[in-house]
Design a protein with these regions (language model features):
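Bacterial N-terminal signal peptides that target proteins for export
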Residues: 1-12
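Formylglycine-dependent sulfatase
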Residues: 2, 18, 23-414, 421-467
């Protein structure tokens, strides 16, 4: 009799074979893998969510139609730095001391998705926003970063020892806006003496798309590649290319118009990336993830024109509007098309899922918090991937378990919400369900005891840096 783990692996292979027979080419041993991350894009701003009639994302909608759209996809934190640290490691960022945007760099003890995919035989690349290097809160570091990069939080400087080239990425075009620390140029040529600081003042989303296309062109058809694309949009500054706002001339609010224009530019970029893959015969056997690092900011002076409708809250908060984000996975040769997945997932799941697609099992000693989603998406496993999901950010902490969500604010304030009810996070049910409150309190305390620092916040923290 075969061991359970072997049976599970055999069943997964057979399920891929069945999907492949229906979809076309057979699944290769190692598909190409691309992870696309937008910046501050709210849950409402994906056309296929059906929340807003002013959103136009035909390429992202097509990606969802060709794969799986996650109805309850979450970021690992409600702001940029910890969210990206979680995605890149597959571990809760609070486990290794990254909780706010003021924290960093990513500890050397943590292995990134670049490290893992390189070990799996992939050539690895990163384009765009990195934001897990040395914190610009450090005065000496500030002096070595171009002023626009300090303002917009990218930390791209050739003097930084925490660039992606030292964190598992063979090649990179790293930067958010104008200044890029790069190992190759937009023509696809290797830059001697890398990292080289390049300046390109053109529209940032287009530059980042061109860098992604250059990386694909360098490696298509040679060996499997892994590419992380960190678009710096629709995060402020609201400066889309001149032709994009005209698409939304009917939108009266100028910030909303600019935000929609930036999202449309990302959508165009994803379309160009997919077209490049198809032209090279790679469209069927490339696994693409798309998500946002957190929800949209809504407060006056911080808003970027994106929206979280109908969710409660915004960037920097642990209500749904802060962490529930667009989340799509498509792999025509390996996943069913047109599926809407109902169970909660989190960006921590991207790393182990990518590894599984590459034929690599996560090891227990890695202590990943994310899980391989493939058997859940192919139907091999029907239960929810996670019993609970957890967050801690500044003065807030939260645990989600199925339809229930418990929020904590210091010193001892608790709110229980039924996410399956029409009221969602607008009605506190702590008095009505004391048993659920007790159960989830215990789970949250146990999880918090494993974080660094351990425990739940005992007092409000001033300015947890949610910019």
């Amino acid at each position: 009799m075969l061991p359970g783990s072997l049976l599970s692996r055999l069943a997964f292979v057979l399920s891929l074979a069945a999907i492949s027979a229906a979809c076309g080419p057979a699944v290769s041993a190692k598909p190409n893998i691309i992870v696309v991350v937008s910046d501050d894009q709210g849950w409402a701003d994906l056309g296929c969510h059906g929340m807003r009639s002013d959103v136009r994302t035909p390429n992202l909608d097509a990606l969802a139609a060709d794969g799986v759209r996650f109805e309850r996809g979450h970021a690992s934190a409600p702001v940029c730095v910890p969210s990206r640290a979680g995605l890149l490691t597959g571990r809760y960022p609070t486990r290794f001391g990254i909780e706010t945007n003021a924290d960093g760099p990513l500890p050397a003890s943590e292995q990134t998705i670049g490290d893992r995919m390189r070990a799996a035989g992939y050539v690895t690349g990163l384009v765009g926003k990195w934001h897990v290097a040395t914190s610009p809160a450090n005065t000496a570091q500030k002096k070595s970063i171009p002023p626009d990069e300090i303002l917009w939080g990218d930390n791209a400087t050739v003097a930084d020892p925490h660039l992606p080239g030292r964190r598992g990425f063979d090649e990179y075009f790293c930067g958010a806006n104008r200044n890029y620390a790069a190992s190759f140029d937009l023509a696809g040529r290797t830059l001697p003496g890398a990292p080289v600081l390049l300046n390109d003042s053109r529209f940032r989303v287009d530059v980042q798309t061109e860098a992604a296309l250059a990386f694909i062109g360098r490696h298509a058809g040679t060996r499997p590649f892994f590419l992380y694309v960190g678009y710096f949009a629709p995060h402020v500054p609201l400066a889309p290319a001149a032709d994009y706002p005209a698409r939304f001339a009917h939108v009266a609010d100028p910030k909303r118009r600019a935000g929609l224009a930036l999202i449309a530019a990302i959508d165009d970029g994803v379309g160009r990336i997919r077209q490049a893959l198809r032209e090279r015969g790679l469209g069927q056997d490339t696994l693409i993830f798309f998500t946002s690092d957190n929800g949209a900011p809504l407060r006056p002076g911080m808003e970027n024109g994106s929206l979280n409708t109908p969710l409660v809250g915004e960037k920097g908060q642990l209500t749904e509007g802060g962490t529930r984000v667009p989340f799509v996975a498509a792999w025509p040769a390996g996943l069913p098309a047109g599926r809407v997945y109902p169970h909660p997932v989190i960006s921590l799941d991207i790393l182990p899922t990518a590894l599984a697609a590459a034929g690599v099992d996560a090891r227990p000693e890695w202590k990943l918090d994310g899980v391989n989603l493939l058997p859940f998406l192919t139907g091999e496993q029907s239960e929810a991937p996670h019993r609970e999901l957890f967050w801690r950010f500044g003065p807030q902490a939260a645990v989600m378990s199925g339809r229930w969500k418990l929020l904590h604010h210091p010193p001892d304030h608790w709110q229980l919400f039924d996410l399956g009810s029409p009221e969602g996070e607008t009605r506190d049910l702590t008095a009505q369900h004391p048993g659920e409150v007790s159960r989830l309190k215990a789970r949250l305390h146990a999880w918090a005891a494993e974080q660094s620092p351990a425990g739940l916040p005992a007092a409000p923290i001033r300015n947890p840096s949610n910019r």
